[in-house]
Amino acid sequence: MARLNCVTVLAPAKLNLALDVVGLLPSGYHDLDMTMQAITLYERVVLRRSPYLNLRLPGSLVAPNNKNTAIKAALAFFDYTSLLAGVDITIYKNTPVRAGMAGGSADAAAVLVGMNELYGAHLSMSELCALGAKIGADVPFALMGGTCRVQGVGDFLKALPPVPECWFTVVMPDYGVSTPEAFAAYDRVGSSIHPDCGAQEAAIRAGDLDALCAAAGNALEECSGATDTGAIKALLREHGAVTALMTGSGAAVFGVFRDEGAARAAAQAAKRRWKQVYVAQPDRGGARVSR
């Protein structure tokens, strides 16, 4: 078999169909209960064999540095496999930053999957997820993708059946939200929103989109500081969204639609006020090599 010199990986962004803060763990981290959904909006990551470790972010205003999740993933991979090598990483970002859509986690997952393929390491999904968990809480989900019930700090994942057919319109305001600041605000003021993730899991298993949406919610929404959330939700609902909510710690907000036409009409309306608007469907996978 010929040696691979270059690999391209696609890694889906994620949405939180539900996010509840259950409490605090002994570690001090928040105990979460969530439903995560991969969507057809992808980070594209190209990895090439190299004697050095390099990272490029074409078109990004963020300068590459050792705190980048992609670099952390590469270093974790080399440490775990004891490979004496390098890799050249180019990330073509499509997911907005500080949006609550796990773009950085998707990048890390893409690097782990790509390097596993590039260097023929044959690491299992469980090994990749264990490495990913050391990099970021959402990296294991970015590796698995699809639809998952996620608990703890992101370390307990249960794969669920695909959600019923639907479309998502995602709107990102002109600012981002800091995840630590959002959780700090939650600790100060709490939330009246506590979605029933168990009911949502049952709805997904039953293929019931209405019940899925009825159980949707985000406990961080009221305290995220994202001032456009209410206006975005109202616009999406006016254009037929079954439900609308913030994803993750924000600042992106999305609506769930039954059909593509309504989702795209909502997107066109949103673009009159907000620049970053996306239309996507559920994705049944996670980070994977693009053939």
Task: Indicate residue ranges for each PLM-predicted region.
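Conserved, helical-rich catalytic subdomain that frames metal- and/or nucleotide-binding sites
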Residues: 144, 149-243, 258-264, 268-275, ...
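Short, basic/glycine-rich phosphate-binding loops at helix/coil junctions
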Residues: 51-63, 111, 205-216
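ATP-binding N-lobe of GHMP and related small-molecule kinases
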Residues: 1-99, 117, 121-126, 163, ...
